[in-house]
Amino acid sequence: MKKKLGTSFIKLFAILVLSLLLTSGAKAGCDDAPTDGVDYSNCQFSEGQDLSRAYIPNSNLSFISFIKVTFDKGVMMNATLANGNFVESSFIRTNLYEANLEGGIFEKANFSSANLTRVNFKGASLIETNFTNSNLFEADLTGANILNATFEGANLNNAVWID
């Protein structure tokens, strides 16, 4: 009887622990579908993925590698893309309102017609980045490397450029 009771207790305990882990809001895995608040920090994704129209506001994409990935027409408001590698990625008409892109590498990225209102680009690498017709109202570009970037038709009202 003692052995049976002990085994039942262990099974019950295991079920309880497993259910707590599943309902605790644990960090998302790198294979999880894009959604609001997902945490992909430190994940590596294959080159050339198409994540157009992805809805990932409030998500953590920091310390991530997304080389040549398409995020066109996506929603990434309040997302964190800090210290990520987004070389040659496309953000055409993407909504990045108040996103944190601090220290990220966005060389040759395309932000044409993107909403970059109040975006934090502090210390980011923006070499040959395309901001044509984008909205950079109150964006913070302090200390960013902005070599040969294109700002034709962009709204730069109240943007911060201090080194």
Regions found by a protein language model. Name each.
Residues 2-14:
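Bacterial N-terminal signal peptides that target proteins for export
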Residues 2-5, 21, 87, 102:
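A general, composition-driven signal for non-globular sequence regions
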Residues 11-23:
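Bacterial N-terminal signal peptides
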Residues 27-163:
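Tandem repeat scaffolds
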